[in-house]
Every structure is written in C-alpha cells, then in structure tokens.
Amino acid sequence: MKSKRHSKIIEIIKSTAIETQEELAEELKKAGFDVTQATVSRDIKNLKLVKKQDNKGHYRYTIIEEEKNEMVDRLSNILANTVTSVENVDKMVVVKTISGSASAAAEAIDTLHLGEIAGTIAGGNTIFILVRSLEKAETLVSRILEMIEG
C-alpha cells in the first residue's frame, strides 16, 4: 500500500500545485487513500520532496531529482550560450568562450562535478581543464560538446 501511495503522491505533485501537507492529504483521500497528516509528513520525508517557488511566487512540493535535472539544464544553457570551441591537448581540455564568459562557464563545468576533472583555470575567454588521463580528456570534450549542441 505504501508504494502505491508513494506512486500516487509523485503523480499528484507532478500534475497539481500542492503547497501544503493538508492539500496533499486531501488529494490522496480523493484518490481513495486513508491517510493522516503524520503519514503524509513521513511520505514527504521518505520521498525526499522539497518545496520550491514556482513562477507565480507560490511554494509547491517537487521531487529533488527534478531539481537536479533543472540545474543541469541551466548549467548546460550557460555552456551553450558561452562556449565557442572545445579541444583536448594531451591531458588538458581547452575551452574557448565569448569574451568575459570563461569564469561563468568554468563555474558551470565545476558545478556539474564531472569526475574526470582534476581542476579548472579560467581567464577572460579561455578555460584550461586538467584531466586525469588522455582518455578522460576525450570523454570530457565529448560531454561538453553534447551539452552545448543539445
């Protein structure tokens, strides 16, 4: 019953703006689940739901995984809008950006926590990325190109 309820909760928060535990409990009751606010509270904790402000200024429950995907999309957009070229030179990856954008692009790359990176250095329009091996440098170039090309 718990897994069915959890599935229903995910379905509800994806389709309806739920701002409070009471609203979620009400929606679950409409769907035929007999729940208390304490049960809903535990479910929210177990499902790792978080509240996020929507574009209308209201806070609603969302799934952390969706938050991660949204962050990756934002960081990919930064790269897509700033990077002009990417190449690997031995264990280094050289990323060229539009003027003044290297720091923002490097921060996006660092925030993505790409495991193959040992470190980044950003200038005004160039980023040097030290990678742990030649193979991983080639992989990183492919990953960055994939992000900027969509």
UniProtKB/Swiss-Prot annotation:
Keywords: Amino-acid biosynthesis, Arginine biosynthesis, Cytoplasm, DNA-binding, Repressor, Transcription, Transcription regulation. It is found in: Cytoplasm. It comes from the Bacteria. Pathway: Amino-acid biosynthesis; L-arginine biosynthesis [regulation]. The keyword Membrane does not apply. Gene3D superfamilies: 3.30.1360.40, Winged helix-like DNA-binding domain superfamily/Winged helix DNA-binding domain. SUPFAM superfamilies: C-terminal domain of arginine repressor (SSF55252), Winged helix' DNA-binding domain (SSF46785). Coiled coil: none annotated. GO terms for molecular function: arginine binding; DNA binding; DNA-binding transcription factor activity. GO terms for cellular component: cytoplasm. InterPro entries: Arg_repress, Arg_repress_C, Arg_repress_C_sf, Arg_repress_DNA-bd, WH-like_DNA-bd_sf, WH_DNA-bd_sf. Pfam families: Arg_repressor, Arg_repressor_C. GO terms for biological process: L-arginine biosynthetic process; protein complex oligomerization; regulation of arginine biosynthetic process. Belongs to the ArgR family. Regulates arginine biosynthesis genes. This is Arginine repressor. The lineage of its organism: Bacteria, Bacillati, Bacillota, Clostridia, Eubacteriales.
